[in-house]
């Protein structure tokens, strides 16, 4: 015991400490840039070619691709248990073999996606230019990444450097130049080239050419051409050279000032406390040496939430432990209660001792599992301790009494632990995002139960063997008097109240069975009738309010900046209002405000500090203060830990994009029929206008091809990459193109000239034309088919989202499948996760019950008694439903996990009871007397195990902090399920036992009569 305690204590520093466990990401990303290309072109030239090259590889579960302007990304979902590194190598081989990629595209990169633990963000903000801000950010990044416990530091949304050589159409005509000539001149002059070595006797002398241009002055001095008189035409005479940033629309403000973020990550062995403390210390020290007017702020600190949740779980766990000890002290001898309580510590320390070797650490899931097992691990010790105490009370000596008492319950205790483990086993195999993260629960539970079994069967009896008999004249102290009174009351209640009541129930056992069946049906009707609200993931308030406003495609960047300023101003006003209130004088309600303006999109992030701030109410105020946002295409605000997206989401796949375009209108019309459905959007909602070029007949006579026109248009508007220069740790692109003003207007296409191969200049309008077509912002594909996603929101008083989706699929789905050949329809989003989760739980829960049924059948040598053991499971579900209804909680995925946990607990009492009844019958006792005596004998341990499980969870069930809200549904399911199932164990199980005996007697009688009848019908042989 001492070794387990020491081992557990020394293992704590070895455990990873993080907010949530590391998820398993079995994905590979193939990314390829094709700058300046439209989504449709990226799809055809990049995404489709990659998909066709790799789709038949072994190990691929699913292929998804996204084609956006200038980049194509293909995501490969790897099959479970297939080696990801092997598939990555196979994909690399296939992709490298593709020779049909566009020549202007970048090389594809194939990356195995690994999870990185974000440990917060350091925000740099102040009165600096964008270049000064980035230069400072790069210095701070390099310093911070060298700190201990820090793996990766990334600059957030910092625009890459770029050298832009801008040549106007007028300059090209004035100097009779083409983009190709300027490009060739720059490439020829800006170069570093090793030229070998002069092999001298004294040693080699390296020959180097150093003409690489690195900054604006270097490029401006490049000679484009010179005449015979020596007069030179410099690049500065023809073009404007701008040493600037890539043309990306992004502008970040933090607390009203220009800002840049440093994201801090840890890749392996995360320790949220050590890492964040290191970063905080570095920030405090480094801020002292920053330029005037520049500040650092460490925020989005995960250690804050981690500490708060650890504090909540530990305090509630200790509170539950105290309540458990109090309950034990009220009914058991102090020494017995003490050693039973020590069993909890031993089980926990043993679990901590082995936990590092299971791949689990200390996080919200594993800590909650410890809390969950608080009332479970004590059950074995209570049953063994009570049995030993009873044996010793009958006059058996200490050691002999301990052996006899332990042997009497060893079978039900062992099978109870095994059955509980089997019921928790499905959590090892849960699908979806939360599957791998939930493994901490069964790992902790199984380890704790294993050590609890060792402690209760080996360690506890050895302690109880030396417990002195209770004195004939008990101590007159208040504790003894209280314990004797409680124990006496419980014994009298069992004999004088419970036993007569049970006898009446047994004489009317059929009616008792019908009564419990009605209760079960009532609870199922309560759930199925919609009286209980459900949500796959409970909405739990976060420390942040996140706002996103999407503007119409093609709008000016100034519109995004104006919208960002509008959101920030509204947030600042609310911040001032809240922080001026008296209750927030010590701790402000709102701290930091981040506003990001991007291309047609604005993001707002508001950090709350005070625990008692209602972020839901604050979000409503923020939304109302913004007023009319009709000019926005989409507005979303979220204040929860996990944004589930819209509750209705349907995914359609087809090889015909025209079919999907028409289908999008059909789906909208179908959803609009349901009351309460609003804000219907689809992935074709955001059209992107495209200019499509075509040649005129005159072009052929001039020898101009469509390729010539396309290339020169690309050079003018997107630009041509001349070279890349290494500078300040990154590759800087050097681009030649039109000035920004000429690239902003469509009319400039008509005014530009196309150069022929013989040097002639022809107006664009003479040889080509263009038309405006509607394209897409992005094109999504699933398993080599284009997809359409339609999503919608549902009002609180509307129909359940799942019911709406199922109705649409049932009524409209067959029509769409017939109308659009090759169409596939799937649920998507949280609804799909919910269905997969429920199906997995039903399947694996049923499998667990079959396994337990088989184990019980072997143990009891009966097929009826295992059924009696498992009757507790549906009635545990009944208790969970009534618990959610009484306390007003939504049924969520955690509620279902609580029901599974409850199932593993409630069968234990049935096992103990049935085993005792069987022993009494083996001793020759009449069935009715055995039922009454066995239930009375096991009344105290059954009540104690149920009450300790319940009271151990009461503190977390009554917790009001945000940190506990998403765990309470599981606690409600377990605690109320155990309490309701206790009544089933003490009343229904004996009644069903008797009913089974009646059925057995009836079947025996019927069989006997059939045998007698068949014997009479046999014709006697002729003599």
Name each model feature, range by range.
Residues 17-28, 64-70, 105-126, 154-160, ...:
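Flexible hinge/switch segments at interdomain interfaces of large molecular machines
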Residues 1-17, 409, 421, 478-535, ...:
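Signature of alpha-helical transmembrane segments and their immediate interfacial
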Residues 8-11, 322-389, 854-938, 943-959, ...:
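Hydrophobic transmembrane alpha-helices and their membrane-interface caps
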Residues 31, 73, 99, 143-322, ...:
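Extracytoplasmic/periplasmic membrane-proximal domains and adjacent transmembrane bundles
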Residues 6-100, 105-108, 130-157, 534-607, ...:
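Extracytoplasmic/periplasmic
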Residues 374-388, 410-429, 436-484, 604, ...:
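Transmembrane alpha-helices and their membrane-interface boundaries in multi-pass membrane transporters
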Residues 18-21, 302, 352-368, 428-445, ...:
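Short helix-loop junctions at transmembrane helix boundaries
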Residues 299, 306, 310, 385, ...:
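Helix-loop junctions and hydrophobic alpha-helical segments within the transmembrane domains
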């Amino acid at each position: 015991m001492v070794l387990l305690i020491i081992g557990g204590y020394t293992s704590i520093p070895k455990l990873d400490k993080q907010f949530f466990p590391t998820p398993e990401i079995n994905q590979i990303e193939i990314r390829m840039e094709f700058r300046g290309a439209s989504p449709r072109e990226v799809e055809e030239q990049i995404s489709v070619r990659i998909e066709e090259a790799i789709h038949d590889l072994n190990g691929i579960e699913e292929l998804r691709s996204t084609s956006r302007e200038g980049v194509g990304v293909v995501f490969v979902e790897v099959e479970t248990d297939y080696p990801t590194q092997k598939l990555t190598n196979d994909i690399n081989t296939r992709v490298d073999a593709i020779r049909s990629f566009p020549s202007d595209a970048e090389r594809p990169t194939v990356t195995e996606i690994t999870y990185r633990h974000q440990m917060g963000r350091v925000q740099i903000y102040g009165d600096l230019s964008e270049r000064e801000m980035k230069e400072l950010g790069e210095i701070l990044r390099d310093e911070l990444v060298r700190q201990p416990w820090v793996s990766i530091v990334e600059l957030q949304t910092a625009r890459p450097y770029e050298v832009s050589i801008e040549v106007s159409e007028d300059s090209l005509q004035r100097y009779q130049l083409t983009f190709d000539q300027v490009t060739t001149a720059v490439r020829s002059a800006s170069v570093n080239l090793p030229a070998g070595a002069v092999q001298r006797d004294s040693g080699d002398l390296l020959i180097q050419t150093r003409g690489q241009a690195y900054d604006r002055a270097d490029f401006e001095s490049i000679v484009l051409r010179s005449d015979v008189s020596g007069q030179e035409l410099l690049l500065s005479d023809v073009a404007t050279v701008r040493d600037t940033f890539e043309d990306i629309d992004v502008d970040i403000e933090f607390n009203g000032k220009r800002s840049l973020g440093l994201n801090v990550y840890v890749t392996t062995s995360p320790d949220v406390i050590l890492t964040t403390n290191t970063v905080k210390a570095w920030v405090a020290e480094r801020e002292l040496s920053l330029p005037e007017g520049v500040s650092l702020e460490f925020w989005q600190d995960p250690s804050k939430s981690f500490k708060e949740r650890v504090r909540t779980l530990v305090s509630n766990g200790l509170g539950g432990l105290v309540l458990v000890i109090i309950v034990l002290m009220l009914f058991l001898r102090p020494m017995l209660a003490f050693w039973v309580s020590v069993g909890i510590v031993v089980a926990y320390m043993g679990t901590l001792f082995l936990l590092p070797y299971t791949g689990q650490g200390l996080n919200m899931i594993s800590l909650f599992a410890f809390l969950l097992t608080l009332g479970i691990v004590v059950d074995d010790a209570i049953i063994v301790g009570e049995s030993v105490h009873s044996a010793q009370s009958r006059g058996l000596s200490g050691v002999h009494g301990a052996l006899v008492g332990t042997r009497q319950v060893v079978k039900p205790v062992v099978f109870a632990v095994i059955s509980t483990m089997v019921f928790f086993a499905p959590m090892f195999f849960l699908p979806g995002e939360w599957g791998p993260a939930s493994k901490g629960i069964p790992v902790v539970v199984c380890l704790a139960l294993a050590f609890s079994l060792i402690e209760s069967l080996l360690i506890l009896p050895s302690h109880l063997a030396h417990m002195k008999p209770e004195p004939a004249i008990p101590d007159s102290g208040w504790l003894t008097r209280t314990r004797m009174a409680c124990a006496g009351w419980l014994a009298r209640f069992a004999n004088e109240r419970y036993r007569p009541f049970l006898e009446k129930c047994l004489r009317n056992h059929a009616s008792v069975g019908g009564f419990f069946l009605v209760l079960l049906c009532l609870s199922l009707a309560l759930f199925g009738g919609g009286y209980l609200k459900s949500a796959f993931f409970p909405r739990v308030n976060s420390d942040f309010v996140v706002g996103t406003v999407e503007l119409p495609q093609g709008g000016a960047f100034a519109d995004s900046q104006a919208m960002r300023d509008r959101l920030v101003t509204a947030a600042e006003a609310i911040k001032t209002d809240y922080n001026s209130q008296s209750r927030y004088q010590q701790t402000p309600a709102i701290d930091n405000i981040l506003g990001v303006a991007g291309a047609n999109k604005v993001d707002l992030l508001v950090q709350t500090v005070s625990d008692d701030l209602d972020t839901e109410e604050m979000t409503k105020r923020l939304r109302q203060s913004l007023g009319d946002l009709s000019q926005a295409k989409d507005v979303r605000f979220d204040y929860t830990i996990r944004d589930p997206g819209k509750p209705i989401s349907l995914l359609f796949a087809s090889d015909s994009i025209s079919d999907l375009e028409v289908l999008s209108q059909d789906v909208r019309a179908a959803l609009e029929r349901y009351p309460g459905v609003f804000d219907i959007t689809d992935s074709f909602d955001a059209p992107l206008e495209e200019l499509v070029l075509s040649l005129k007949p005159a072009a052929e006579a001039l020898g101009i091809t469509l390729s010539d026109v396309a290339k020169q248009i690309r050079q003018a508007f997107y630009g041509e990459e001349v070279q890349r220069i290494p500078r300040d740790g990154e590759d800087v692109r050097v681009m030649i193109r039109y000035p920004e003003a000429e690239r902003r207007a469509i009319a400039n296409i008509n005014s530009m000239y196309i150069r022929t191969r013989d040097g002639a200049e022809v107006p664009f309008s003479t040889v080509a034309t263009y038309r405006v077509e509607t394209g897409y912002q992005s094109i999504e594909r699933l398993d080599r088919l284009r997809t359409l996603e339609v999503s919608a929101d549902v009002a609180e008083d509307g129909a359940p989202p799942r019911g709406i989706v199922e109705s649409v699929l049932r009524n409209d789905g067959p029509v769409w499948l017939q109308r659009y050949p090759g169409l596939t329809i799937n649920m998507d989003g949280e609804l799909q996760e919910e269905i997969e989760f429920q199906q997995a739980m039903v399947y694996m829960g049923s499998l667990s019950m079959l396994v337990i049924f088989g184990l019980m059948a072997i143990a009891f040598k009966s097929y009826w008694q295992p059924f009696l053991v498992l009757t507790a499971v549906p009635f545990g579900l009944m208790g969970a439903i009534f618990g959610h209804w009484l306390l007003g909680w939504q049924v969520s995925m955690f509620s279902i996990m609580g029901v599974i946990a409850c199932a593993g607990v409630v069968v234990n009492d049935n096992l103990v009871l049935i085993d005792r009844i069987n022993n009494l019958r083996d001793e020759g006792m009449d069935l009715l007397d055995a039922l009454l005596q066995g239930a009375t004998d096991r009344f105290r341990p059954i009540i104690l195990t149920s009450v300790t499980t319940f009271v151990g969870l009461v503190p977390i069930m009554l917790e009001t902090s945000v940190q506990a809200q998403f765990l309470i549904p599981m606690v409600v399911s377990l605690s109320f399920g155990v309490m309701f199932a206790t009544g089933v164990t003490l009343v229904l199980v004996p009644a069903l036992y008797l009913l089974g005996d009646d059925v057995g007697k009836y079947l025996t009688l019927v069989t006997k009569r059939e045998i007698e009848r068949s014997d009479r019908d046999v014709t006697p042989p002729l003599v």
